[in-house]
Amino acid sequence: MKGSTLREGTAMASPLPQDMEEELAPVGSEPGDPRAKPPVKPKPRGLPSKPALPAKPSLLVPVGPRPPRGPLAELPSARKMNMLAGPQPYGVSKRPLPFAPRPSAEATAGGDVTQESGKEDAGKEDLPPLTPPARCAALGGVRKAPAPFRPSSERFAACTVEEILAKMEQPRKEILASPDRLWGSRLTFNHDGSSRYGPRTYGAPCPREEDSKSPAKGRSQEGTAEIPAECQEEHSKTPEERNLTSSPAMNGDLAKLACSEAPTDVSKTWVTSSADPVSEHGGSTSAVRLANISVPASESPRLSSRPSSPCHSQLSETQSPAASEASSICLPVTPASPSAVLPAEPPGHSPSSELPAEAAPETLSPNSSPVETVSGHHSPEQPPVLLPQLLTEGAELPDITRTFPCGEEAAARGHTESRPSSLAQRRFSEGVLQPPSQDQEKLGGSLATLPQGQGSQSALDRPFGSGTESNWSLSQSFEWTFPTRPSGLGVWRLDSPPPSPITEASEAAEAAEADSWAVSGRGEGVSQVGPGTPPAPESPRKPISGVQGNDPGISLPQRDDGESQPRSPALLPSTVEGPPGAPLLQAKENYEDQEPLVGHESPITLAAREAALPVLEPALGQQQPTPSDQPCILFVDVPDPEQALSTEEDVVTLGWAETTLPMTEAQEPCSVSPEPTGPESSSRWLDDLLASPPPNSGSARRAAGAELKDRQSPSTCSEGLLGWAQKDLQSEFGVATDSHHSSFGSSSWSQDTSQNYSLGGRSPVGDTGLGKRDWSSKCGQGSGEGSTREWASRHSLGQEVIGIGGSQDESEVPVRERAVGRPAQLGAQGLEADAQQWEFGKRESQDPHSIHDKELQDQEFGKRDSLGSFSTRDASLQDWEFGKRASVSTNQDTDENDQELGMKNLSRGYSSQDAEEQDREFEKRDSVLDIHGSRATAQQNQEFGKSAWFQDYSSGGGGSRVLGSQERGFGIRSLSSGFSPEEAQQQDEEFEKKTPVGEDRFCEASRDVGHLEEGASGGLLSPSTPHSRDGAARPKDEGSWQDGDSSQEITRLQGRMQAESQSPTNVDLEDKEREQRGWAGEFSLGVAAQSEAAFSPGRQDWSRDVCVEASESSYQFGIIGNDRVSGAGLSPSRKSGGGHFVPPGETKAGAVDWTDQLGLRNLEVSSCVSSEGPSEARENVVGQMGWSDSLGLNNGDLARRLGTGESEEPRSLGVGEKDWTSSVEARNRDLPGQAEVGRHSQARESGVGEPDWSGAEAGEFLKSRERGVGQADWTPDLGLRNMAPGAGCSPGEPRELGVGQVDWGDDLGLRNLEVSCDLESGGSRGCGVGQMDWAQDLGLRNLRLCGAPSEVRECGVGRVGPDLELDPKSSGSLSPGLETEDPLEARELGVGEISGPETQGEDSSSPSFETPSEDTGMDTGEAPSLGASPSSCLTRSPPSGSQSLLEGIMTASSSKGAPQRESAASGSRVLLEEEGLAAGAGQGEPQEPSRAPLPSSRPQPDGEASQVEEVDGTWSLTGAARQNEQASAPPPRRPPRGLLPSCPSEDFSFIEDTEILDSAMYRSRANLGRKRGHRAPAIRPGGTLGLSETADSDTRLFQDSTEPRASRVPSSDEEVVEEPQSRRTRMSLGTKGLKVNLFPGLSPSALKAKLRSRNRSAEEGEVTESKSSQKESSVQRSKSCKVPGLGKPLTLPPKPEKSSGSEGSSPNWLQALKLKKKKI
């Protein structure tokens, strides 16, 4: 049996421990070699075959000295496995503290003393005792569990190991104290495959205890006499030494096992006299244990008897439930009386012989620890005993019984496994053994109890403390993560104490507080039970006899205190110094009292172990391995009727519960069990948690409780490594969410629900902080339910939604939770609740209902549909968006989130700060975003969610394509939705787990936001809703909120998707959507209702809040999507608010920061995708506002264009677009507070978040972000523009907004923008596009396009009418139709997408558009590449520069189209800026000016594209001025617009030109190497102009390259000027490429000479000369720019040089530089 194996291993391990001890202390593997060799030879044979040892070489290295332990050599594989699994870190966590001193002392004098005492004890004990003493010595000194570790080492080789042992002995000695070694021992033992999985570990402690105790009776009496001195001595030395010295007999075989498994030391401590556990656990515990051993020398036998009795009782229990019962009953009978030990001793009848004792204990071991036996955890009969104990111990005891069942099972497992993961398993085992510990205490309250309960639990708990234990789990997670640290139990015990104390001091105190709270809240009954039971003065802890096993609450505070105390030398010395008798007994009792907490902590290790067990495959095996484990299960079932079925879970769960015991043992058992068990249990334990959260609300609970919960989640999730690491991450990093994410959808939902709860928590706002934390922790822990509930409970929300809806929802319908809990909680949140409230009045009822009704809404999807159709759905969306944001915000700025403004602030602060924090804090973001991402990603998680999902959408797989094929949109969204709610969530959870990285989180966040925004904007909901449309079944999850949401949201989505899809239905849908979108907007923006209700004012504010929040939350997790979406929406929302846009700017600023990063990225992608399909992009990008904007611009722009072109049809088509374009307008108008607000709301509905943000600002946002314009900067710029023009000309404003879209729509779809501008009213879209700045520019462009719409629209948009309709479109009604139409066209154009053709059918000018689409496609193909990059480049421009940058970006984005647009934008911008809204008025006029500038601008833009890359505000401004100057030439402007048709010929000529192609390449390179960004302008101007002047090159870097170029190199520049601007552009592009100093090595004179010769040749051959001049300019510039490291860009110049056939030296230089650059 595993018991036999363990016994064998223990016997073998016993020699090994001795050897280890000797080898460790004396270096001699000789003492252990003879004994160890026989076992080592066989075991290593088996173990060498095990690859586990190699798996953990770090451990093995320390184990090197121990290889003589053949038997344990086998154990190390499992131990190593467990070590790898990661539960051990927690087991190690506790032990390291006790071991920390122990290894040191032992290393110094303790080693010898320990050896001596161990050997002496061993001598007393004969071989088995000797082996245990050796082990004890290893334990006492090594209790580091290096003995097992040596077998680990030995695993590598048996004979070789001996040799290695000789080599590694010394290291082993060192390693004795080394974490790896102790770790290895613990882990080794834990990974005692059979021990951990089977009763081996279990029995090992018990038998060892018996063995130890049999010898301990004889030897413990002797040895106790010795040990009292030795123990005190060793106590002062080290807990390990004390353990070794204190309880050689007790430690005996157990010591072997303890040595084998330092983690088991706790269990060992259980079985071993208190001295063992105490010494093992730390000074205090050791003192107590030593007190038990040394002070109660006479009690030592009793302790021996008692441990023997429990052990044997366990054995008997395993063997006979009656004996078990008797023993168990005896234990209860004598909670603290030693006499009970004697009665228990007969059942235990510890084998007289050490081997029998060892065998029996091992046999017992399979069952559980003696304490476990005490728990009666094995026998059904025992449960009554435990139940009496439970009754005695009070309410907490039943939970403990519950815990004990699991705990005992876990204790059996835990002892089996806990030996390795001494801390966690011990904790768990002791948690299980806590009642037995009581019983043992009852059995005499002798050392056995202390070793088991006090020593193990209190020591374990103390080493880790309630909070500390979490910390220790964390630390040891790290230890586990970093085997070096966990290598040695003893060493890390020493090392661990500092890490552990980090948590211990603070967390132990906090844990003490939290535990005190938990004791008050959870352990109240326990305290009641305990106080009467305690025999010792320390009643709270003393209740150990009555409550010890069941006194997690009491034990917790005291344990924390005890932990702090045992950890603190003061306590330890006092215990050591104090009389070994009463003080030690008292301490022992205290520790016994603490012991339950240790047991609770132990379950954590069990949970961790279980998490590791899955890794090792023993989690189930743990329970399964032995009948005794099953009896444990049986007992668990019996004592824990509630959780009888949860036994397995309970083992894990109880481990978690006990681990979370700091929270509430009574709760935690439920929490533990229910979490694995399911919603019911979850609700129950959540209720418990709700009762207990306040105590653990503190950081201790957060750290420990959260960690514990994390442990629960890993336990539940069987995350194993990750789970524990997650726990650690959560407590330390707060990243635990991920772990539990993958654990189970419910857990995910718990997380989500936690978010929902967090939202709800946000409702209680004040609690949000806690909710956030707890939510993060719990969510992270995957105990969103308990977490949330607890959190809700903690948070005065009482979160009925959480408790009722949330818990039920979480249990019942995660989706509902998500949808409702979230919306409910959202509703609960004043902000969204109010918005939703007054949005629907259901929201009002929902607000009152918020929690209740939301839950009901959650429950009542119909209600959600009816009331929360949008309300719930809105709430859901808001919950998603807003709640997500709020939740994210809650996570970040919980308290702020608590307030609407707090939410706003949260959004803002969160967005700017916390968004980045979240971005930075992947954990939180991961928690929130992952949760959200899990949720939204789940929805979006076709691939990774928004990433895949967005790209699906944004790639045209989403948005337009999805939109274009709304079916496909639905399909995709259905996919998304189907995916999203359930599949996707789970997938996403997995993805999040797998892809929880910030990237994925960003993706998920982005996608989440995008999804949310899309859903909110219709994208997410759209997919969700289409999914709902496709099947409302999915709406269940998504449709939960989508269900009701789905209809309206679908409607809205439809409207939006149709708007996106631009199908006429969208008109109806738009109307619907306007209805819906009011709430949809609220929903989407989390502001629709509010926005709708208070569209201009309230909504704007609320929208601002929500938008900001959504935006920021979006940033937070939507990042790009939300950033764009909400960002834009925020701006508009804020714009709606008037000055709000600035906060959005703020928000955007923060959001832009990372959105800049992310958004930039997405923007480029977005922009490309968005260009591809505005609808699609919009749909896609609904969440991805940036390019949704772009889209929005395309859509909005185009929508406006289309709206202009085909007001009606496009409106139908563009309803959503128009809507959200209108929305943009409406937003902008919303800002004005026009009826457009309704439309805005509808637009928001459509694009709820999208219109708001997407309308223009999202694009601007993204664009700005992309450009780094400081989105806030130029988004406010945009906002201001939008705001000013918005107020003045709401269409223009939306255009402004659209300009943001157009802006990077310019980048992205500058053509679209251009088309948009042209199509749009110049001002409206111009403003919007030009971001007002170049939105005006664009407005001019729009005017330009508007003026030349026939031309442009003919050429580009081919739509004069629509363009003219732009004015009406400005009105927003007609515009959107045109816009919609146009957007497709623009999108077509912008992306070169065939949307134009789609639009074609819709728009009469679509063919023109198509041409532009092609041209623009080419143009945009280049421009977006360039543009997207340039926009990214522009990202750095300031707001004012942003306008210029926008111009530049437009130019850069459109490269060619951008020049047109930028020329137009410059002129238009000036005009529009001057006119503000003169877009419509100046349409015709600006068009022409735009045209004129456009060609000029075009060359510039190429140049400027580089400049844009340079992102020089002056350059941009110069470009703008230049463009403005050039704005007078209408024809060129038209070509730019015509650029698609006519200019494209020119532009494409160059593009087609080799140089142009090269330029494109160079541009790409330039974009890639933006390092040259600032250089690019210099190259452009300097390239042509600065050829002659090096200094001038730098100066001209930011000057117009065109004019200076001409003046600088008259011939070549003139030629260049004379050359088609396309050529110049080509040059510019080439220059762009050349802007890198082509010839850094070339001297200015040489370059000039070459240049002159080239110029001459250029005069002869202008083309060559121009190229040469470009090269020369690059070369000359290289002179100047050479220093900045522009040499790298030389790669680009070489090609032009080659192409221009520059002189040999130049090519040589170029080639050399090329090579250099390439090499670089």
Swiss-Prot record:
Disulfide bonds: none
GO terms, molecular function: ankyrin repeat binding; enzyme binding; protein serine/threonine kinase activator activity; protein-containing complex binding
Modified residues (N6-methyllysine): 1635
Protein name: 182 kDa tankyrase-1-binding protein
This protein's GO CC annotations: adherens junction; CCR4-NOT complex; cytoskeleton; cytosol; heterochromatin; nucleus
Biased composition (Low complexity): 296-316, 502-518, 742-758, 1477-1489, 1671-1690
Biased composition regions of type Polar residues, renumbered to the chain: 266-287, 317-327, 449-459, 1402-1411, 1428-1457, 1515-1527
Region (Acidic): 209-1563
Gene that this sequence comes from: Tnks1bp1
Basic and acidic residues biased stretches: 117-127, 232-243, 840-866, 991-1014, 1027-1039, 1208-1230, 1593-1606, 1656-1670
Sequence motif Nuclear localization signal, residues: 1620-1626, 1714-1719
Quaternary structure note: Binds to the ANK repeat domain of TNKS1 and TNKS2.
Alphabetically ordered keywords of this record: ADP-ribosylation, Chromosome, Cytoplasm, Cytoskeleton, Methylation, Nucleus, Phosphoprotein
Basic residues bias locations: 1568-1577
Modified residues (Phosphothreonine): 131, 238, 503, 533, 1275, 1554
Location of the region described as Disordered in the Swiss-Prot/TrEMBL record: 1-137, 185-472, 485-595, 659-720, 734-924, 955-1081, 1128-1153, 1198-1255, 1358-1546, 1567-1720
Pfam families for this protein: Tankyrase_bdg_C
